[in-house]
From Swiss-Prot:
Keywords: Ribonucleoprotein, Ribosomal protein
GO molecular function: structural constituent of ribosome
Record InterPro entries: Ribosomal_bL28/bL31-like_sf, Ribosomal_bL31, Ribosomal_bL31_B, Ribosomal_bL31_sf
GO BP field: translation
Record's GO cellular component terms: ribonucleoprotein complex; ribosome
Oligomer status and interactors: Part of the 50S ribosomal subunit.
The protein's name: Large ribosomal subunit protein bL31B
Gene that encodes it: rpmE2
Length: 90
């Protein structure tokens, strides 16, 4: 390997802002920001919008939302079916 062409591999603190969860991960990502972690050490800090702590695929929320949406759509579509609501209004 050539010297001086590879990025520095170091421990970086990633923060999932949606779930307020911190991850210490080895990375080559650059950051000008630093943050003091709960272990008392200062690490380069990179905020994240989504991680495994907040993404619906990993939390299981996506399925629940889809099911609720389908049920609500079904109930809305067939709310008056069989109840005679349209005949009573006419």
């Amino acid at each position: 390997m050539k010297a001086g062409i590879h990025p520095d591999y170091r421990t970086v603190l990633f923060h999932d802002t949606a779930a307020d969860v911190f991850f210490l991960i080895g990375s080559t990502a650059d950051s000008d920001r630093t943050h003091v972690h709960s272990d008392g050490n200062t690490y380069p800090y990179i905020p994240l919008d989504v991680s495994s702590a907040s993404h619906p695929i990993y939390t299981g929320q996506q399925r629940k939302t889809q099911v609720e949406g389908r049920i609500a759509g079904f109930n809305k579509r067939f709310a008056s079916f069989g109840s005679g609501a349209k005949k009573a209004e006419e």
